[in-house]
Amino acid sequence: MGASLAININPQGAGATVGRAVPLTFVLATIGVLLVAYGFARICSRLSHAGSVFGLTGITIGPRAGVVAGWALLGAYLSFMLTTSMTAGIFGAEFLRGLGLYETTPGIVPWIIALLSVGIATLLAISPVKKSMATLLWVEICTTAVIAIIAVVVVVRVVGGNAPGGQRFTLDMFMVPPGTSTSTLFLGIVFGFLSFAGFEAAASLGEETTNPKRAIPIAIFGVALFGGLFYIVGTSVQMLGFGSDAAGVDAFSKSASLFGTLGEQYIGAVVGDLVTLGTAVSAMGCALATAVAASRLLFALNRGAFDGRGFTKVSPKTGTPISATLFVCGLAAAIIVLVRVAVTNTAFDLFAWSGTVGTLVLLVAYGLFSVGAWYYLCVRAPRQGHKAAALDYVIPLLAIAVIGYTMFRNVIPWPDTASGRANIVIATVWVVAIVVVIVAAPKTTRRIAQSLNSDEGLASEAGYLAVAVEEVDESLREHNVPTTSLATPAAPGTAQRGGSARAAKS
């Protein structure tokens, strides 16, 4: 998930449960992600390989666990496609309001833009436009830079006593509001984890270096630490800008674009509109990335389960799994229409619901990986003569504890709202379904595991940075400049473009 996208909408989801303490939930989420990152860093450095969550889980504790992790990731990607598409709709509608097309956003507009986002993602996933991901990367960088400028202005004006609403400097956002239990923070932390989704993809940029055992941990920890600091500082500035009192928290929760609103209030309408537009474009890019990731993972799962039948059509020109892509994007569009017609008129509801479901199943994958990391580092590696470090015995267990308690707190006590219960049921059914398949069809499970392991590149996330770097590689090769490609080799039977696959390993 792009940083500008996450910082502009995920905090509202946490704010609905923890009020002013949103930055505190991101502190906890950052700690949790760093604990998980430790396992990734240690395993990848031992194996000198930047594998996916499901690939490394399969290596450390067995192919069955790897299949569960792969299935969980597919559920997360499908959910996040809904999340990011709806986010594009919400920010796109807010941008049009800023242009003066209407004073109050018509309820249908975000849904229409979300469907357009799915359509654009479908077209680009099937027939990628050269340089499109590099362009999206630059939009993300520029939007993040504008957000940083707004943050500085907000802090200066609040500290100087010149805030537009009389807001004063305070650190109340790092204290749990009266009447709210500390354990409630673990309800809001879900949106913190959502902001980090896919952080382990940074390892793909370290794998091709001359010293991967050093580069991979730096890449993983660097992304997790930078992301954590960005989100903690960003949400703190947001609370300062809106105010940590009841009125400020209410305005915070109702804002369609957090830094867009702050830019408009503290600097000018044009600045706010730029942030909102940039975030909408970032959301569309993330929708494309999740569509690419989900379709390739579905392709690999389907090939293993049905022995080459089903979603197997691949473009001879681009190597894109066309049938899987059309199914994933068509399913996303159908769900958006169904939810709008039969469930809710509020666009933010689908954003929050899909984000929660996706994060819960993603935590299952991260939890399985953390179990595998502890087992590999503390049991298997010592048997092979590799002594475990003292932290190896502790950090993965802490990661398991944080993930486990987060999931427990989202279930117990049982939610009062129908949507809260539905989120848990959907996530549970998704995970239980693959467990049933594993128990009932062990031969199918083995085929799926083999398909996933042979196609890690095909079942990976299309991260902005990895794909953008690959495009730079291709440009250099066209001009006969020697370069070491950061791209993932194409899986057997798939076509390559410019000598390299379009997927970046997660």
Label every model-predicted segment.
Residues 12-23, 96-107, 129-140, 274, ...:
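Transmembrane helix-loop boundary segments of multi-pass membrane transporters
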